[in-house]
Amino acid sequence: MSAAGAGAGVEAGFSSEELLSLRFPLHRACRDGDLATLCSLLQQTPHAHLASEDSFYGWTPVHWAAHFGKLECLVQLVRAGATLNVSTTRYAQTPAHIAAFGGHPQCLVWLIQAGANINKPDCEGETPIHKAARSGSLECISALVANGAHVDLRNASGLTAADIAQTQGFQECAQFLLNLQNCHLNHFYNNGILNGGHQNVFPNHISVGTNRKRCLEDSEDFGVKKARTEAQSLDSAVPLTNGDTEDDADKMHVDREFAVVTDMKNSSSVSNTLTNGCVINGHLDFPSTTPLSGMESRNGQCLTGTNGISSGLAPGQPFPSSQGSLCISGTEEPEKTLRANPELCGSLHLNGSPSSCIASRPSWVEDIGDNLYYGHYHGFGDTAESIPELNSVVEHSKSVKVQERYDSAVLGTMHLHHGS
């Protein structure tokens, strides 16, 4: 003990123990826990002597009691008027620093309850929790943390208490302090916001059947397209089945090029097609048909999609319809049980507009005007509202053909009449 040797050198001829007993009787009583001697001395000692520092460590009697864990002596000194937050002249250390370094949690807790400042730094910028980390006292660290000690404070060398414990080899204390630091850093990140992360700005994207082009409904500020307001999206009527997860369904929404759909040769009106279409991946799918006397019918059964999304009908149950597919001659074809077409057509608009189901070029188009009108594919970017309803086009085509047959019959009759 170099400090004690220096003190003994000052008083030549005296041992450190003799010097302590003669010159600093209060300090000696606190070291040994001699409560009777301490109480007797406190009755005779002036109040100013309670703050006197020894020549060995530069401690007051309170520091001695705290370092050696003499709680009864500490209590008597404070009752006699000793100051809790008194700092030493040499290192500016309080009794809380000394108790933490000595590894005495009982004394430390009592000092805290009596009003000691546990975040006061010493001359090296260290608080009591740094001293507890140096001594490896997990009990003192826990007591300090439980009473509001700051675990993230750094000393003059830039080290936290966790760094000091790690340097001294106290792994358990270091890990405990590191966990506390991480907990403290994450304390302000709540409501699903992670450290360094962001909140989901699109909370409504979990709707399974939502079209990818329309899923960002409330994001006008981000420059994306607003959703249509005419009707509810199909996702409310399209449940997840077969245990498919949200991620699986979301993967099905990846935009792809629209496949060419089988020609709608002599098909029925689009209203029947839209009515009997089934929902796959959030879009309307229009089932393919088998040729019937050289014609293809679009009226068929709605099947469950491959990803478990159905239109609400039981599998195998044909969609009820009061009429079959109309041929050019006006006769009805019986309804058939059909299979879903794996090739989906463009489905930007699901409100019955033609761009939801127009093929590359309908095979029933004959004249040059119709060819020009349907000369391009109505897919992404087309405004369906600017295109006339397909029912009207079909009806017009049928009317023209009927008129041509009527004119042909009239001309034939006139030729026969005049020829005879």
Swiss-Prot record:
ANK repeats (start-end): 21-50, 57-86, 91-120, 124-153
Pfam families for the chain: Ank, Ank_2
Gene Ontology MF annotations: chloroplast targeting sequence binding
Keywords: ANK repeat, Repeat
GO BP term, pick one: protein targeting to chloroplast
Lineage top rank: taxon: Eukaryota
PANTHER family assigned to the protein according to its UniProt record, in alphabetical order: ANK_REP_REGION DOMAIN-CONTAINING PROTEIN, ANKYRIN REPEAT DOMAIN-CONTAINING PROTEIN 42
Protein's UniProt name: Ankyrin repeat domain-containing protein 10
